[in-house]
Amino acid sequence: MPTVIGYHEIKDAKHWLSSPKREELFGPLGVTNIRTFVDAQNPTRAAVLMDVPDLDAFQAAMQTEAAAEAMNYDGVLPETLVILLER
């Protein structure tokens, strides 16, 4: 199962860390082992590391309105999102 990293900027680290939206969006896709990271020097930079069983389904889900709504709720700045795939 490939590991995926989503790196992006956020508005508020405390809110982002406590949000249930990651599990709500990625859980039905079978995504597991979701871990969160925040830059200690700049708390507006954050990342999610997760195991993704189906990259095509994951990438399709990231293009949906549900993903846009989850990112908005979480305070993610979508224009800063970079997805890194394990190779």
Protein language model annotation of sequence segments:
Residues 1-87:
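Short S/T/G/P-rich N-terminal loop/turn motif that feeds into the first structured element of a domain
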